[in-house]
Swiss-Prot record:
More info: CTPSs have evolved a hybrid strategy for distinguishing between UTP and CTP. The overlapping regions of the product feedback inhibitory and substrate sites recognize a common feature in both compounds, the triphosphate moiety. To differentiate isosteric substrate and product pyrimidine rings, an additional pocket far from the expected kinase/ligase catalytic site, specifically recognizes the cytosine and ribose portions of the product inhibitor.
Protein's job: Catalyzes the ATP-dependent amination of UTP to CTP with either L-glutamine or ammonia as the source of nitrogen. Regulates intracellular CTP levels through interactions with the four ribonucleotide triphosphates.
This protein's UniProt keywords: ATP-binding, Glutamine amidotransferase, Ligase, Magnesium, Metal-binding, Nucleotide-binding, Pyrimidine biosynthesis
Protein activity control: Allosterically activated by GTP, when glutamine is the substrate; GTP has no effect on the reaction when ammonia is the substrate. The allosteric effector GTP functions by stabilizing the protein conformation that binds the tetrahedral intermediate(s) formed during glutamine hydrolysis. Inhibited by the product CTP, via allosteric rather than competitive inhibition.
KW Magnesium (keyword) present: yes
Pathway(s) the chain acts in: Pyrimidine metabolism; CTP biosynthesis via de novo pathway; CTP from UDP: step 2/2
Protein name: CTP synthase
Family according to the record: Belongs to the CTP synthase family.
Binding-site positions, Mg(2+): D70, E140
All residue ranges annotated as the Glutamine amidotransferase type-1 domain in the record: 291-535
Swiss-Prot/TrEMBL catalytic activity: UTP + L-glutamine + ATP + H2O = CTP + L-glutamate + ADP + phosphate + 2 H(+); L-glutamine + H2O = L-glutamate + NH4(+); UTP + NH4(+) + ATP = CTP + ADP + phosphate + 2 H(+)
The EC number(s) this enzyme carries: 6.3.4.2
Amino acid sequence: MKFVVITGGVVSGIGKGITTASIGRILRARELEVTAVKIDPYINVDAGTMNPFQHGEVFVTEDGVETDLDLGHYERFMDVTLSGAHNITTGKIYQRVIEKERRGDYLGETVQVIPHITDEIKSWIREVGKASGADVVLVEIGGTVGDIEGMPFYEAVRQLQLEEGRENVMFVHLTYVPYLEHVHELKTKPTQHSVKELRSLGIQPDAIVCRCERPLDDGVKRKIALHTNVPREAVIDAHDVDLVYKVPLLLERQGFGDYICERLGLDADEPDYSDWLDFVTRIEEADDEIRIAVVGKYVDLPDAYISIREALVHAGAHVGVGVDVAWVDSEALEAGDSEAWEEVKDADGVLVPGGFGKRGVEGKIEAVRYARENDVPFLGICLGFQLVVVEYARSVLGLEDAHSTEFNPDTDHPVVDLLPEQRGVKRKGGTMRLGAEPVVLEEGSLLRRLYDDREIVLERHRHRYEVNPSYVRELEDHGLRFSGHSPDGRMEALELPDHPYFVGTQFHPEFKSRPGDPSPPFVGLIKAAAGQGPD
């Protein structure tokens, strides 16, 4: 088993996740089995209770763990299914070590960062690699080198190379090379200092991947190679591209895949990018473009909806159209902002994603009503699904006070209510209905057709509230069709039969969308928005 450790320097947020996922794609193109681990040095046990404005999207794995959004990149680029074990946090590591100490596993030792914390980190990485049967384990360390919270993890991977052998562990350092416009020059000094910091921790990088606004010339690459002690061919240009799915191809063209295989002694096939190139080409050569209005409360940070965005791209490539996303603030709709409403009215389709909290909810409900009344293709996900029920109960059933008890505990018509098993639950972290659950699709329904007539599909969930079963019959008597349910009778999906495309899902279909296997509800939305009919 081989390991590739990806570290970052200079600044955070320059694309370690995409770089790691792209390395995974490069190795997968050579028919190698690859898995990935994301290390987040924060003390939170998981990402589930973190503000999306700080952290971005919470990505839910098949086994129901709330993880970092980079796991979504890994799954999409590498076409693999990962578990919650693939996201390590400081909180998880300390939790494990403290549990062992309480059990007496350390036989009276003084428990310390070295060796106990570092040993646990190494053990976790090896366990994930062994369980996956991977040829190569990618390990991405979040943050930047020098961050105090990351120190135990850098020490652990240093020890990992010492124990596994240099021939089995490779370090890739992602850095930022700024371009100063006033002198027309790319500056390498931040990279030099970043690598100096990394080497002070006992880690010599084997390759430097340089994020930059424009391509690096050969002179800059040679300068970086000289000052960071890596071969010239191991200085890789990762300049800005207009589509993240081009990044593996950009790295491959510079020989990075061959360099990794040579460095680790991997016996790999010639790379095959035919499917990947076809996907990228379909995006680039799309004749038409449609516009989808995504109505949410975190739209100032599109990373909060990154799986939504990518699922729209996947579906667009499948249908053969480009997808332009208009990010619409639901609070602005609520306030009657004319520009925000113009974005909705100019769109070919509307999507209301999941979310939490009362802020902006009425704006989302108004967006649902607009799409329903004006025959605009619509997809509601999780909270978006629940708000369809609220809007329908108010507008069609005449239950003016109808609401979710999440937002109005005293409503006379709780058409959306807390899941029975959630009553009495006090802890917030990891206690929702999470992960993959079976959904039974009704025969003859639009959703069943979109899912290739499969009766049961497995989709991922993240919610505490559900459609109140007491109102289901009345809603259906007034034309709303619940076309998907759980085996024990919970409402999982809905549609309006006489609408061009009006679908809601309690589950999150975006989490399982892949470039070569787009999510069916998203494909239906894009087809309808493009005027092709949903199925």
